[in-house]
Amino acid sequence: VFSHTFVSCGDNDDEPKITYNNITMDCKTTHTIKGDDSWTSSNKYIASVSGNTLTAERVGKAIISSKNNSFTVTVTPTVSVFKEPCLEWGASKSRVKSFMSGYTLDKEMTNQLNYKGTGSLILATYNFQNDGLSGAAIGLNGDYVNSEALSEQMTQYYIPIEVDESNYSFYFITPDEKTLVLLKLASSGSTIIYAIVYVPRSNSSSRATSEDLETIISTIGISASGNPSEKFNEMKSHLF
């Protein structure tokens, strides 16, 4: 939804001023900003500006501003394969339970919550340290997932960082650079399993370490011995 309101000011003004209203854009679309201002974005990974062309890069909100004006752009996804888990690092178990109120709690331990999935979702799991959320993951059943749509959603939500071909893994970071994301593939027979794992970014690290992910991945049960290389290579061509 785009909206620019033209307002005529006092008689001493040479020309009418432009009032810039907040807008909503689909991811990967562009919009031309009216006027001659020089614009910048509060987060170029969500919405970038080149001249007067505004590009919706990834899902989220960014403030587009010039010397005299500003407005907020909200970027929305065009695909929806999975729902993100709770990523409020440090949150309590009660907060995560509230976030997951529409799902069935399968198992609760001192430092972990596991939820049953439905449809393509195998399960969702949360890890806690010092009573605060420290990791989250979802497992997806590839029999119910379009891999091209999954790749597209990953690029609409996250910034690709690295590929690990030996481990059938893709690494990402969120546009606010606060969360590291791993997409790992495995196969069990003809079924591809996708694990999407989230951990808070620590220090200056740009990717999650194997130590960060080991416990969460094992919870999903992605130790299947099959070879997902064909599907992995298909996704790699889309993601990188």
Predicted regions and their residues:
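C-terminal motif of bacterial Sec signal peptides marking the signal peptidase cleavage site
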Residues: 4-8
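Short strand-edge motifs at loop-to-beta-strand transitions and within beta-strands
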Residues: 52-54
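Short, exposed beta-strand-loop hairpins at the edges of beta-sheets
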Residues: 65, 181-190
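Short Gly/Thr-rich strand-loop-strand
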Residues: 156-177
